[in-house]
Curated annotation (Swiss-Prot):
Belongs to the tRNA nucleotidyltransferase/poly(A) polymerase family. Bacterial CCA-adding enzyme type 1 subfamily. This is Multifunctional CCA protein. Its EC number is 2.7.7.72, 3.1.3.-, 3.1.4.-. Keywords: ATP-binding, Hydrolase, Magnesium, Metal-binding, Multifunctional enzyme, Nickel, Nucleotide-binding, Nucleotidyltransferase, RNA repair, RNA-binding, Transferase, tRNA processing. It catalyses: a tRNA precursor + 2 CTP + ATP = a tRNA with a 3' CCA end + 3 diphosphate; a tRNA with a 3' CCA end + 2 CTP + ATP = a tRNA with a 3' CCACCA end + 3 diphosphate. It comes from the Bacteria. Mg(2+) binds at D21, D23. A single active site specifically recognizes both ATP and CTP and is responsible for their addition. Monomer. Can also form homodimers and oligomers. Residues 225-326 form the HD domain.
């Protein structure tokens, strides 16, 4: 019985990165051997055990065979005769198909170290095509390390998409990999890889449809709506924004794919037009509620947020109410963060100031100075409970108006200079 450290732990060790989780493979043993040594069985589908002291996962070396479409259609074989190389061969990429023995020696039968040094993601064997999740995982690794995909691997990924393997993916698994990819250092790269292999058209056709749709060059020097979306997503990542914010950044302009061709490159009403496509994506991916709600909010209101300097005080109050800013100020603030990414996610606009965010937050703070509890009590005492909402609005407007007037004056002064 021999144990080897495998997979991501070996890869990250060779890259000089912190090793978070350690997985082990056991060669020359069976389930009875593991149980006799005090290991606890935990694998539902595979022979995986927890070490009695470290609680790290130890899996028996195994081979796999495809039995049906999708990522669950597999049968496996694990016994004492399965070799380390056979176990490594079933893995997805060469950089994940390395092992380290007890003496620290690296076992690398498929050239993983070479590909790490070259910054290449390459599949281990044709068995890569048996699991469609590997399309998403490869795109995610590209986003993490900014590696390129080997030509033969991207070709195989295209074939998998053409054969309908991506259609067999279930929403939960897509979201799991997709969310991880959005939180990588270079999420733009994930979307680019998915587009290159054709999977984006299957998994996120609404995003794929943005590529080739022109925008006004004075607002968007990058011209292409798809490129702007990638730049906005990447800017959100560079800002260190959260998963809901990055997800909203990706979906904020879906309405531009709905713009009638006769008015291009203008996109009047794309904020409203994008709401339904955002809902469709949310439903298809079964996005968590906090991600789905923020994506819809940003899509619907980002243009209004940008144009705050042009709004009347009553309109501002209406927006604060409709976006639920009084009850959910944190979500309101995250929506404004995405608006910064939208503004700066344009060619040569990475450092464009966005005073609108601070102004919206100041407007919300000012409106909250109106003592709604006191106003409600006074109205009830006067037998005018039906006027509570109206009186609260009036008090809030009294707080908003001077602030908005000062902002517009400062804006006019800046424009004149």
């Amino acid at each position: 019985m021999q144990t080897y450290l495998v997979g991501g732990a070996v890869r990250d060790y060779l890259l000089g990165l912190p090793v978070k989780d350690r997985d082990w493979v056991v060669v020359g043993a069976d389930a009875q051997t593991m149980l006799a040594q005090g290991f606890q069985p935990v694998g539902k589908d595979f022979p995986v055990f927890l070490h009695p002291e470290t609680h790290e996962e130890y899996a028996l070396a195994r081979t796999e065979r495809k039995t049906a479409k999708g990522y669950v259609g597999f049968s496996f074989h694990a016994d004492k005769d399965v070799t380390l190389e056979q176990d490594l061969m079933r893995r997805d990429l060469t950089i994940n198909a390395m092992a380290q023995d007890a003496d620290g020696k690296i076992i690398d039968p498929f050239g993983g170290q070479r590909d790490l040094a070259a910054g290449i993601l390459r599949h281990v064997s044709p068995a890569f095509a048996e699991d469609p999740v590997r399309i998403l995982r490869t795109a995610r690794f590209a986003a993490r390390y900014k590696f390129e995909i080997a030509e033969e691997t991207i070709k195989l990924m295209r074939q998998m998409v053409e054969n309908g393997e991506a259609d067999a993916l279930v929403a939960e698994r897509v979201w799991q990999e997709f969310a991880k990819g959005l939180m990588e250092k270079n999420p733009r790269k994930m979307i680019e890889v998915l587009r290159e292999c054709g999977a984006l058209k299957v998994l996120l056709p609404e995003v794929n449809a943005l590529f080739g749709v022109p925008q006004r060059a004075d607002y968007h020097p990058e011209i292409d709506s798809g490129i702007h979306t990638l730049m906005t997503l990447q800017r959100a990542a560079d800002m260190g924004l959260s998963l809901p914010e990055r997800y909203a950044a990706l979906l904020h302009d879906l309405g531009k794919a709905k713009t009638p061709s006769d008015i291009l490159p203008r996109h009047h009403g794309h904020d409203l037009a994008g709401v339904e496509p955002v809902r469709e994506v949310n439903q298809r991916l079964r996005a968590p509620k906090h991600c789905a709600e923020l994506a819809e909010l940003v899509c619907r209101w980002h243009i209004i947020f940008h144009q705050v300097g042009q709004l009347k005080s009553q309109t501002i109050l209406n927006v604060l109410k409709k976006t639920d800013a009084f009850r959910r100020p944190e979500r309101f603030q995250t929506a404004l963060n995405v608006c910064i990414a939208d503004t700066q996610g344009r060619l040569n606009r990475e450092h464009t100031p966005y005073p609108q965010r601070a102004h919206w937050l100041a407007l919300l703070e000012a409106a909250n100075q109106a003592d709604s509890g006191k106003i409600a009590a006074e109205c009830r005492a006067q037998g005018k409970a039906h006027l509570i909402a109206e009186q609260i609005d009036r008090a809030r407007l009294a707080q908003i108006a001077p602030l908005q007037k000062a902002f517009r004056a400062a804006q006019d002064k800046t424009e004149k200079h």
